[in-house]
Amino acid sequence: MATIKCPYCSSKIKLERFQYKDIVDSELNDKYVEEKQNPQNYYSGNDTTNIYVDEEMCKKLDQDAVEFGFVRNKNGNAHSPNRNAFISAIMTNYYDEFNVEEEQKKNVIVDTLKQNIPLLKDVSTNRIASCIMAGMDTLASEKIRNKKIIIKLKKTNMNEDIYDDIQYNKFFNNSISSISEFYYSMFQSFFKLPQYLREQIIFKKKFKDLRKYIEEGKTIHMKYKKDKNYRNVFPYKIVQSVEESHNYLLCVEKTEDRNNPGNIITMCISYRIDNIGDTIKLSNSPFEITEIQKQALDESISNSPSSAQQEPGEHILVALTSTGVGLLDAIYTFKPTHIEPIKQIREYTIYKVYGSKFQSYTYFKRFGEHAIILNDNSFKQSQLISAQKIINNYNSISSQLEEELNQ
């Protein structure tokens, strides 16, 4: 026997256990069964969806779009983010993974509901679980409504399968409470990942193809950046650069020697993977990587994956003034990882810098007169030629330009 209060007259009513169970069962379940059968909101068939985001999320989307090359020329700005293309890439490459994560969360909620409210039917349990998950982002949703930044997502050939699945299946079947909030939750989950993992998601097919050829030990043809020509490359390893948060393909390329035209050489190279073209195919001119090249590339992983060494133990010696020593803490971009002081000669501190010589040259050029690279006659000559050109520019050409400018 159970005693309950009448919701209309507030009088107490005694009920048998089976009667009480039927009332509670009806109260718990009828609402959700009705919502399941008669959804109030439905997909209208529109090929454009409004996604409400806050300023921070909008900024993250735009930054990653530009970083990963999803740009278009708009009003003379060649680096304007192409949001629709970038969001489509997230949808295509992250949708399934995100759904698995969401399903795992929902299953935990469903199990908890079943354990604590056994009278709930499956349809009610699933509906309540969906409502709870939607409520997890309530504060974020309010923040979005207050900001009122709208991203218009257009249905395209690239995203249409995922677009329709979200609109027709998820929303119409009440598995999500709001299309906009679903996209926002997917974006939130995506941006919780470090940049190098986001890059692997956006370029999923490219990474899959590269890993396949690396595992098989096959030479490939690929394009890089805006170069229309294919490069003949033996892919060795995919690595991450901690300071830049990018992924790099360490490889050996068979190419013409720039210093000796007509002479074909192989050289160690590091390519940023997001700049590699989408088309990667088996080479019709295969070659093998040497053990020395493997060792050089392995050392590059710890020294600096963004710039490949040409030989094991590669390093330079550089003399820095006191100002130059201070610049080591001020200039970060392209900075070598391992820089070791070995000797003091008068006002100069001598450093041994491990890793790619090309990277070291590029880095220490910015130190001007406060850095002198030692024991490298070729670099010395190139610097002297460059310095002489600068002297000539200021001794003669600058005066000529100033005269013509003032005419």
Give residue ranges: language-model regions:
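Surface-exposed, Lys/Arg-rich phosphate-binding patches that contact polyanionic backbones
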Residues: 55-82, 157-181
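Core beta-strand-centered patch of the WYL/Sm-like small regulatory domain
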Residues: 192-316
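Bulky hydrophobic/aromatic content
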Residues: 117-146, 150, 159-222
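Polybasic (Lys/Arg-rich)
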Residues: 302-407
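Short Lys/Arg-rich basic patches
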Residues: 1-6, 10, 33-66, 108-162
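Short Cys/His-rich "knuckle" micro-motifs
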Residues: 14-19
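Short, basic amphipathic alpha-helical segments that act as recognition/interaction helices
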Residues: 31-34, 77-107, 174-200
